[in-house]
């Protein structure tokens, strides 16, 4: 009985925190100071990315505004990397990393920015992309409007090059749709700092110049940066008009590897900044980050305890409790189906084929539940940075 009471308490607490985070927490609007200088560079960490990087470079060349390709810097790790040949072909800079013992995207960005400062080649804005990205022709035109309006950091709208390739890529794309439409849009409407998700964003020199480097080196440097932005009250913007594309994993194994890394990185960041977050809970931005995924964790724990309660009592009334376990499982599956339908409804720009939408509605609940495995693995094993293969796969 006590297990059931604890389960219900956790569920109600989770729902309460969700309501506070989603509907109540609102920060004061910070006045914008317009930027008049907009000399920018493009940074692309690209270890062994010769399969995909040319598509990104060509999309930069094809922008609706003129881009100086000498302001593009591709970061590689080996002088024999074929990526260098593509850089030479398109007349863009390449930088070969020196500190190869430091493995993460954050360290690659640290090295190139420190190199630019040492060379006295300092920019007003630094755009950061993954090598498998492709940019809409108006991406820079739209993003520079954000910078000129005074936003310290802004991210574009992420779409997928291979969203219709299979059900795994479709469900992976829905993960970013969740970040875009249920998180960042809501945060922006309440003047709260958005969540940066890896690529397709700029960071102003107002932030970079404090360190003359890129000081975010944990496994998920993007989430670490997001927490820092909240703590320091920087002004962020989510620009739905600045569209960029990236490639999603095609196999469940690759997806698990990617998402386990995200979970491990999330835990790393929370551990590193926990004390700082507690000190700044009067800042509604930070309070929102403190709540973060806590509602979902509490609700998940509530469900796990409910399953434990049913299993422990199964010997008393086997048929009754087996039925209850089946009903609970079907109820959870149905709720996640409704959640998936909501995501598909809210984000009509994903361009998912009808057949893939049907598959995603049926499969995405399983995809979401597999995060339990990812979180468990992240908690009990040492996850390191592993390369995710990119193959320029398109629909």
Language-model features: locations:
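N-proximal low-complexity "stem/linker" segments adjacent to membrane-targeting elements
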Residues: 1-58
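Juxtamembrane C-terminal module of membrane proteins
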Residues: 22-29, 33-37, 275-288, 316-395
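Cell-envelope/extracellular polymer assembly enzymes that use nucleotide-activated donors
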Residues: 38-41, 71, 224
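Acidic helix N-cap motif at the loop->helix transition within catalytic regions
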Residues: 54, 81-88, 138
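Short, acidic, metal-binding catalytic loop of nucleotide-sugar glycosyltransferases
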Residues: 58-69
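A conserved acidic beta->alpha catalytic loop
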Residues: 76-84, 99-101, 134
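Acidic donor-binding/catalytic loop of UDP-sugar-dependent glycosyltransferases
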Residues: 82, 129-146
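Long helical/loop segments within the catalytic core of UDP-sugar-dependent glycosyltransferases
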Residues: 96-98, 102-116, 139-219, 260-263, ...
């Amino acid at each position: 009985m006590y297990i059931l009471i604890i389960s219900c308490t956790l569920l109600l607490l989770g729902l309460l925190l969700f309501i506070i985070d989603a509907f109540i927490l609102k920060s004061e609007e910070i006045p914008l100071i317009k930027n008049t200088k907009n000399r920018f560079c493009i940074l692309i960490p690209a270890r062994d990315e010769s399969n995909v990087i040319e598509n990104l470079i060509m999309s930069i060349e094809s922008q609706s505004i003129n881009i100086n390709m000498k302001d593009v810097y591709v970061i590689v790790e080996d002088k024999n990397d074929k990526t260098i040949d593509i850089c030479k072909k398109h007349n863009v800079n390449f930088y070969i990393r020196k500190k190869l013992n430091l493995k993460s995207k954050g360290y690659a960005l640290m090295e190139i920015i420190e190199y630019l400062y040492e060379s006295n080649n300092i920019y007003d804005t630094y755009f950061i992309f993954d090598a498998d990205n492709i940019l809409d022709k108006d991406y820079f035109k739209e993003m520079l409007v954000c910078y000129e309006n005074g936003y310290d950091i802004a991210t574009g709208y992420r779409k997928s090059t291979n969203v219709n390739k299979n059900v795994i890529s479709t469900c992976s794309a829905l993960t970013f749709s969740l970040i875009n439409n249920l998180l960042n849009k809501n945060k922006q409407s309440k003047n709260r700092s958005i969540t940066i998700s890896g690529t397709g964003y700029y960071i102003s020199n107002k932030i970079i110049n404090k360190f003359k480097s890129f000081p975010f080196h944990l496994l998920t440097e993007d989430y670490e940066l997001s927490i820092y932005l909240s703590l320091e009250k920087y002004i962020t913007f989510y620009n739905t008009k600045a569209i960029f594309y990236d490639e999603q994993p095609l196999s469940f194994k690759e997806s698990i590897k990617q998402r386990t890394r995200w979970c491990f990185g999330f835990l790393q960041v929370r551990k590193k900044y926990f004390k700082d977050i507690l000190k700044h809970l009067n800042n509604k931005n930070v309070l929102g980050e403190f709540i973060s995924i806590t509602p979902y964790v509490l609700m998940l724990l509530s469900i796990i305890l409910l399953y434990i309660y049913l299993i422990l009592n199964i010997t008393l009334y086997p048929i009754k409790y087996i039925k209850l376990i089946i009903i609970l499982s079907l109820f959870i599956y149905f709720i996640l189906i409704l959640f998936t339908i909501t995501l598909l409804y809210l984000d009509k720009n994903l361009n998912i084929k009808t057949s893939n939408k049907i598959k995603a509605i049926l499969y995405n609940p399983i995809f979401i539940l597999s995060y339990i495995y990812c979180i468990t693995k992240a908690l009990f094993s040492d996850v390191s940075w592993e390369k995710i293969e990119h193959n320029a796969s398109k629909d």
